[in-house]
Curated annotation (Swiss-Prot):
Classification lineage: Bacteria, Pseudomonadati, Pseudomonadota, Gammaproteobacteria, Enterobacterales
HAMAP family assigned to the protein according to its UniProt record, in alphabetical order: glutarate_hydroxylase (MF_01083)
Protein name (database record): Glutarate 2-hydroxylase
Essential cofactor(s): Fe(2+)
EC number per UniProt: 1.14.11.64
Substrates-to-products reaction catalysed: glutarate + 2-oxoglutarate + O2 = (S)-2-hydroxyglutarate + succinate + CO2
Pathway stated in the Swiss-Prot or TrEMBL entry: Amino-acid degradation
Co-factor binding comment: Binds 1 Fe(2+) ion per subunit.
InterPro entries: GlaH, TauD-like_sf
GO MF: ferrous iron binding; glutarate dioxygenase activity; oxidoreductase activity, acting on paired donors, with incorporation or reduction of molecular oxygen, with 2-oxoglutarate as one donor, and the other dehydrogenated
Pfam families linked to this entry: CsiD (PF08943)
Gene responsible for this protein: glaH
Family: Belongs to the glutarate hydroxylase family.
């Protein structure tokens, strides 16, 4: 724990009654909340958005906000403020979201619709160059020959932030809280922490332009935020290379790492600037197939919390 950010009491009010969903602290950490839409809410939402296939959401971006409003209305307009409050709360900033009745791989389109509705209650999802849409779906199989760790099943995908190789700031990711990282102060105060570094993506990301930014910056209250991924940062010299290697080791060996099971149909929604995320290895199996979905974007309802190069 670093001295800059004290963990506040959990903001979840056990006596609070919500309409259309429940909210409890997760078993893994009081920072991570579990939000579950009731069976009735899920059923009514899917019925009311049935007229729009996923393709309609891809082609008409305003419909993404429409389905968000439908979901919020079904929750007596308590959902949107709760999402924003949680994600912008430094002591939390993460939700594991579940909808009763959406739990089968055959419901992939329903999962995209629900995730789209939730994401567009807090902002807007960025264009994903890898898929050519506002979201990406990709498959992890037992054998993989891709050019990044994203689809490789039998190795750990190290902790990282999303959006490091694009120019847009990525506020949220729909998929380790840095305040729980015991080495944060050491690396945040290092002279290289604020040096702009080059981030370059492999061909599969369909992003040809390199971007430059530091690994660390601060939010409006001077607290650390990160934009980091070990695979795409390109050190220019020995000093940067050694520091980045030590930084990676310090993150991956942290005692503050959480392991959060995400069953079919559930998704994580996190503040991308002060949570890192990764993925553990899958157990080898000839028939291994897991399809994953992501959305990442920016908050549209608050002054930006990222202060560049301060």
């Amino acid at each position: 724990m670093n001295a800059l950010t004290a963990v506040q009491n959990n903001a979840v009010d056990s006596g609070q009654d919500y309409s259309g969903f429940t909210l409890i602290p997760s078993a893994q950490s009081p920072r991570l909340l579990e939000l579950t839409f009731t069976e009735q809410t899920t059923k009514q939402f899917l019925e009311q958005v049935a007229e729009w296939p996923v393709q309609a959401l891809e082609y008409k971006s305003f419909l993404r906000f429409r389905v968000g409003k439908i979901l919020d209305d079904l929750c007596a307009n308590q959902l949107q403020p709760l999402l924003l409050k949680t994600l912008l709360n430094r002591a939390e900033g993460a939700l594991l979201i579940n909808a009763v009745g959406i739990d089968d791989v055959a419901q992939a389109d329903e999962m995209v619709k629900l995730a789209t509705a939730v994401a567009h209650l807090i902002g807007r999802s960025n264009f994903d160059a890898m898929s050519g849409q506002y979201y990406a779906r990709f498959v992890v199989k037992n054998v993989d020959n891709s050019d990044s760790y994203l689809r490789q099943p039998h190795r750990v995908m190290e902790l990282h932030n999303d959006g490091t190789y694009v120019e847009e700031i990525t506020d949220y990711v729909l998929m380790m809280k840095i305040d729980d990282w015991e080495h944060l102060d050491h690396y945040f105060r290092h002279p290289l922490a604020r040096r702009p570094m080059r981030f370059a993506a492999p061909p599969s990301k369909n992003v040809s332009k390199d971007v430059f930014h530091p690994v660390f910056d601060v939010d409006q209250q001077g607290r650390p935020v990160m934009r980091y991924i070990d695979q795409f940062v390109q050190p220019k010299d020995f000093e940067e290379g050694v520091w980045l290697s030590e930084l990676s080791d310090a993150i991956e060996t942290s005692k503050g790492i959480l392991s959060v099971p995400v069953p079919v149909g559930k998704f994580l929604l996190i503040n991308n600037l002060f949570w890192l995320h990764g993925r553990d290895r899958f157990t080898p199996h000839p028939d291994l197939r897991r399809e994953l979905m992501r959305q990442r974007g920016y908050f549209a309802y608050a002054t930006h919390h990222y202060q560049t190069h301060q």
